[in-house]
Amino acid sequence: MTKALQDLTVLEISDDKGMYAGKLLADMGATVILIEPPTGHAARRTGPFAGNIPDINTSLLFWYNSTNKKSITVDIETDTGATIVRELAKSADILLESMPPDYLDSLGLGYSQLSQINPQIIVTSITPFGQTGPYRNYEASNLVLMAMSGIMNSCGYDDLPGSPPICCDGLQGYATGCNLAVISTLTALHHRDTSSMQGQWVDCSIYEALSGTTEAAMPNWYFGKQTPFRQTGRHHGTVATPSTQYESSDGKLINGFDIPPRTVARWDALIAWMDETGMAGELNDDSYRQMIRNRSREKDKVNTIVKLVRTFIHSMPAEEAYHRAQQIRLAWAIIRSPEETLEDPHFTDDRGFFPSIYHPETDKSYVYPGAPYTFHKTPWSVDRRAPLLGEDTLEILHTLLDFNKEDLVLLRESGVI
């Protein structure tokens, strides 16, 4: 079947900040040519490594972020290497890059130069702070961007005096920037193909992408001069809310978002459930139901609800609490470790979220996370594991640029590829 982006050719010159964007395009069918230095993409040297054996071809970070891509090694800082990229750009739809501002321009590979030889090319630049402004050349990591954007200030604990903000793991800042970079790139592509037939430069700031996800923090300050504060395991806010984490009988935690429930119907269902074991107690008093009906929050009543629900959840295993709550439309969930999702049939069997990808060099298949979307007519799939370093160099330079064997030998001997 046809893939959604299978007619697109994308050149990628990235580091760890931009490689996820290339993966998203490749997994939807685009031909993504990863242009690596002869020493390899920086992520290839980042662990953990398969089998705990550090190697240029065993980084799990690189594996995940480079599925379906092709790899060519080119030293773009040489005149010949830069010329090779320009030749590839003549027939490319997109150049995706996450190098520092002005770096590609200094090599003759920026948008202003490439658009002269290919007016239809879209160049998407993913940088920490964008191409303009006083921060444009500032160094940043995922942690720096999460801190600068305000995200970290909303994450942490309210029950540990003086505790600092914390940052979630997993390069979430880079992932957010890359997701929005792909959306903006496809928007530019749509404009090109439906209106102007002209490409454009897309300037993506990870800092701005993250700042736009702080939800009500900015409006609260702008309109009310209120600063949201951190709350353990739940949403930050300007008003303290009850704890949402409750221990079950088997020691696992339930995240009970709907406590107290927001509707009378859900309240009635919760009380009926608790009454099955005689644990609703004074919650049967109509004054609690009236509070829910009026959408008010009387502190003493809320505290009583939380206390009794906590005892109720502690009387049963987490799986029972989770599934029974969902049956009556309460937004409760088990707080899982990431690996526990691998055992959930909803994801493994029904959704097929974890594909197995074959690696011929090890003659083994490995389980990967899939995509959070499915296409009924243009399927998403991982057809190839991440490329070995330079695995496709000879094929691409021969088939796309008509280099012969003698040319390729000379390029390799001179260190260009």
Where are these regions (language model features)?
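Short, surface-exposed beta-strand/loop micro-motifs that present aromatic residues
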Residues: 61-63, 241-247, 364
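Aromatic-enriched alpha-helical interface/lid elements that frame and gate functional surfaces
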Residues: 242-243, 247-328, 332
